[in-house]
């Protein structure tokens, strides 16, 4: 939780089976807003994998689960967690570069992503002029395995993130269900 105060991008890294994905998922359920889990694919090469793209043939924007989560976060007060599961299966700088740049902007008013060059009549309400605002209540949590099937996370990414190492498997335990906690940012 303290890492969320330091950065909008948390990276949970370590060996398989340490709960890197289930930790943010469980935490977000506790906050009354289940996380969106995006499974990063080795084929991710650019921003369209996360943000979608405008199809010139159909004249429609093909949105992604990631983009829907960003959009919905603009309607919520609760913290929104978007989990990039196994984020280093592809080069992070390729598909997440624009988001890294946006989150570095000093003013939250500048946290805006250009999705399409011109606005269309059917654009969602929170998409203004083909752009979408990244809510201050949004955090990105990347999970990363350290093995031969993954890419090394570069200093460019580490400089903008709060890395947390999880290298030991914990013993399973039982606990009583707890009521969710309502938190706003």
Regions found by a protein language model. Name each.
Residues 1-184:
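AAA+ P-loop NTPase catalytic core and its hallmark functional loops
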């Amino acid at each position: 939780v303290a890492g969320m105060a330091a950065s909008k991008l948390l990276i949970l890294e370590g060996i398989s089976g340490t709960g890197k994905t289930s930790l943010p998922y469980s935490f977000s359920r506790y906050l009354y807003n289940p996380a969106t889990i995006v499974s990063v694919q080795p084929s991710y090469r650019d921003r369209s994998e996360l943000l979608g793209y405008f199809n010139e043939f159909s004249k429609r924007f093909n949105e992604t689960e990631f983009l829907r989560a960003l959009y919905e976060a603009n309607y919520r007060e609760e913290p929104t967690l978007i989990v990039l599961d196994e984020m280093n299966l592809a080069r992070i700088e390729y598909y997440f570069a624009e988001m890294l740049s946006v989150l570095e902007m000093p003013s939250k008013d500048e946290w805006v992503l250009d999705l399409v060059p011109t606005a269309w009549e059917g654009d969602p309400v929170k998409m203004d002029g083909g752009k979408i605002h990244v809510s201050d209540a949004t955090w990105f949590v990347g999970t990363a395995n350290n093995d031969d099937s993954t890419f090394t996370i570069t200093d460019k990414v580490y400089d903008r993130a709060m890395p947390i190492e999880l290298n030991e498997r914990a013993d399973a335990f039982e606990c009583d269900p707890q009521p969710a906690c309502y938190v706003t940012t």
